[in-house]
Amino acid sequence: MKPWAAFHLIFLVASSLEGEVSNYGTRGAQDTEPTCRTEHQCTRDKIILQSQPGIPGIPGVPGINGSEGLKGDPGPQGLPGETGFDGIPGVAGPKGDKGDQGDKGDKGDKGDKGDACILDDCPPTDVEVRNCQDLLEHGEILNGWYTIYPTKENPMVVFCDMETDGGGWLVFQRRQDGSVDFYLDWESYKKGFGKQESEFWLGNDKIHLLTSSGTQQLRIDLEDFEGSRTFAKYSSFSIGDENEKYRLIVGSYLDGSMNDSFRIHNGHSFSTKDRDNDTNKGNCAMMYKGAWWYFHCHHANLNGLYYKGKHANYADGINWRSGKGYYYSYKYADMKIRPQQSETTVS
């Protein structure tokens, strides 16, 4: 029921009651007292008012907040959040201590082939310089290391003796102080080894290239520990390639001051401690601690051990049989080549 309908009903009931009260008022005095004496007698005069609930009242004012309760237990840990953005780089810290040296890296790739010339006054590239004699003819008069071109594709750095016997000699072996070990293997003699400022072996592959075209004279110079110098010169010298085991071809003995102890090695192959090519049942290179064109075994052993003069061991020093024999090792020895000349000056 709508509120207005309930109100209208109450109004009608009230009006009816008011009429009855008025009727009672018009009665006489005898009506002033109720005529019923018991509840049962008055039942018919009762009026019972019934109606619909009234309109709800306005909500009251909110009450005061209660006191704070006890702190609850921590809840379970939440899932990790997403990574934030990188912050602004901070200021660089102080420089740390120097670290230890790292491990050696892998070997790099082979570089491009460069200019082999090592002197400030290298000859022009259009000048053909095949050997030390060519350098001498182009005005180079000082002993030292030069670049030559035995072939255009094979530049080579070599030591040139520009003083001895007219100069123009290319030195391929030198002994002078024992600073380099000459008791080495086949591969070492193939490629060459030593130090430019002291002792060296140029390398059998290079010696073969240098002696494979044109006739090369050979000169061997020796000096003992008493300062006495001697030499031997040969009309020609060459060696074969590795397939030929660097076989020696040496010409006639021209002249010298220490007699010949080398031509007996002619026609023999080169031997080292790990490559026995001699005609002996044993390994001559191992027995006499060198590398040479041994047969059964040697008359010269210029790549033997470096002793200071006389030695007790038999024939394993820098020996020259027709010179000071098998028990004396020379202080200095070198072997050098030069293109054959029609006239030579001996010194």
Curated annotation (Swiss-Prot):
Fibrinogen C-terminal domain ranges (all copies):
121-341
Compartments it resides in: Secreted
SMART domains according to UniProt? FBG
User: What Gene Ontology cellular component terms go with this record?
Assistant: extracellular space
Q: In which tissues is it expressed?
A: Expressed by the venom duct.
> What keywords is this UniProt entry annotated with?
Complement system impairing toxin, Disulfide bond, Hemostasis impairing toxin, Hydroxylation, Secreted, Signal, Toxin
The record's account of how the chain is modified after translation = Hydroxylated, possibly at Pro-74 and Pro-94.
Cited function: Initiates complement activation and/or interferes in platelet aggregation and/or blood coagulation.
Q: What is this protein called?
A: Ryncolin-2
